[in-house]
């Protein structure tokens, strides 16, 4: 991944205010990267901060899956996902799939403000970084043949 990161910004409804506040506090750093997000979250961040945030669909309308596809296509390097651990979501299976893809493709994920702070302030944010993607095709061949 390049020094200019492609960052996805995602938040469940009860966590949107926290993500917007975090983006406001970190807008200078975020402005140096390409940003995208799920529908409402992207719109609210753009309105609050003036940052350009490419909007995918809303999470329950397929936005989580769109972000997952973008990760697979190497169009997203990094994800800030403030999720609500106390409320069941109608699209929980999509969220689980998004997290699985994020781990599979070795992208950094922050799911709370503390982790987001650690990641965004890391010296690696300004550098190129090599992902360590597990070759599952090799594993499948080895286990089955």
Swiss-Prot record:
A Pfam short name: MGS
Residues of the active site: 64
EC annotation from Swiss-Prot or TrEMBL: 4.2.3.3
Keywords, comma-separated and alphabetical: Lyase
CDD domains for this protein: MGS
InterPro entries according to UniProt: Methylgl_synth, Methylglyoxal_synth_AS, MGS-like_dom, MGS-like_dom_sf
Gene3D superfamilies xrefs: Methylglyoxal synthase-like domain
Binding residue positions for substrate: 12, 16, 38-41, 58-59, 91
Name of protein: Methylglyoxal synthase
Taxonomic classification: Bacteria, Bacillati, Bacillota, Clostridia, Eubacteriales
